[in-house]
């Protein structure tokens, strides 16, 4: 028998105790539910290079379908983008990335900055472009291959990009190694002696130094892409520029989810959106590169954005990266 006054085992006491638990338990759940709602991601961040372009309509479509706000973080050229993602991998600055290409993919893989697969989004052929008007006005025959750029005829006419920070720059360096073998170092020495200009990134080279885009630059030959002439079609229906389509380097750009992302599901949703017909159809006119899916291309591309007639590749690029960059630095720095 319980002591007098102790009614803890009586039906009334048990009923009261259960009632108290029922009242307290929902109250304990409320903060947990609210906390879960507060941490639900509402934004997805993508780190990319400065040349990434996406229309307001595409942004609105993604945000409406996903319920997420898209934040774009631009980080310079491809090399700078890759290096910054490596440096910040312990505290990722974004959820997804776009713009690491096959020349810098090895760096990303070695440093394990990507969670899952690299999704190919677009491709382009790194080729030299020249200003047709300049050569017509000057009465000079334009080059037919990058191998001719060491000729004195083209002294001081060419602008390229730094292979340490620029993916087109590294692609061209790889092209010379693949095509010339051990003679690539001699080629670069001759190119420097021919007063080639080196810029840090493609945008500076193309939009500032090249005479064929804005018409304000001093250099009529630029390292760019086979598709770039499609962006320079004038009112007369002709492109002011043309591309040298032999011995180009095929560049593929990837997107993916960053390891340690705060919103990996949102990042994956963004990558899938970039593979949709809606996004892929916009790629040519937004970024002047080729989509990876079989979507219809703009009519002008058949005439002004012809893919390279021949390409070169350097499968051992990742293994020889430091070696060939060191050789390049010894010549230019």
Residue positions per predicted region:
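Short, low-complexity disordered leader/linker segments with a strong preference
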Residues: 1-44
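A structural signal for short loop-to-beta-strand junctions that line the ligand-binding cleft
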Residues: 92-97, 111-130, 146-148, 156-163
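Periplasmic solute-binding protein
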Residues: 102-112, 120-141, 169-179, 252-256
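Short beta-strand->loop
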Residues: 115-121, 147, 226, 233-249, ...
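A bilobed periplasmic-binding-protein/Venus flytrap-type ligand-binding module shared by bacterial periplasmic
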Residues: 129-134, 251-266, 282-286
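Periplasmic-binding protein-like
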Residues: 153-164, 273-297
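Ligand-binding pocket segment of bilobal, Venus flytrap-like solute-binding proteins
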Residues: 175-246
């Amino acid at each position: 028998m319980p002591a007098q006054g102790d009614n803890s085992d009586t039906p009334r006491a048990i009923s009261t105790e259960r009632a108290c638990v029922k009242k307290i338990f929902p109250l304990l759940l409320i903060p947990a539910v609210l906390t879960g709602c507060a941490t639900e991601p509402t934004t997805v961040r993508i780190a990319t290079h400065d040349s990434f372009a996406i229309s307001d309509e595409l942004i609105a479509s993604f945000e409406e379908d996903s319920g997420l706000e898209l934040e774009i973080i631009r980080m310079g050229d491809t090399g700078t983008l890759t290096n910054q993602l490596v440096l910040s991998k312990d505290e990722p600055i974004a959820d997804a990335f776009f713009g690491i290409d096959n020349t810098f993919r090895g760096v990303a893989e070695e440093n394990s900055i990507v969670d899952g697969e690299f999704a190919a989004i677009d491709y382009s052929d790194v080729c030299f472009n020249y200003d047709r008007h300049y050569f017509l006005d000057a009465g000079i025959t334009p080059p037919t291959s990058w191998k001719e750029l060491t000729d004195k005829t083209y002294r001081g006419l060419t602008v390229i990009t730094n292979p340490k920070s620029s993916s087109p720059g590294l692609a061209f360096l790889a092209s010379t190694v693949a095509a010339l073998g051990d003679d690539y170092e001699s080629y670069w020495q001759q190119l420097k002696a021919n007063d080639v200009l080196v810029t840090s990134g493609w945008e500076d080279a193309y939009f500032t130094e090249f005479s064929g885009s804005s018409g304000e630059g001093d250099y009529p030959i630029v390292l760019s892409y086979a598709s770039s002439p499609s962006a320079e079609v004038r009112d007369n229906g002709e492109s002011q520029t043309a591309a040298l389509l032999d011995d180009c380097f095929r560049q593929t750009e990837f997107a993916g989810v960053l390891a340690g992302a705060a919103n990996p599901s949102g990042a994956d949703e963004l990558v899938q959106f970039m593979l949709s017909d809606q996004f892929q159809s916009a790629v040519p006119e937004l970024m002047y590169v080729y989509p990876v899916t079989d979507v219809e291309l703009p009519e002008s591309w058949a005439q002004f954005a012809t893919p390279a007639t021949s390409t070169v590749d350097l499968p051992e690029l990742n293994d020889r990266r430091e070696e060939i960059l060191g050789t390049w630095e010894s010549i230019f720095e």
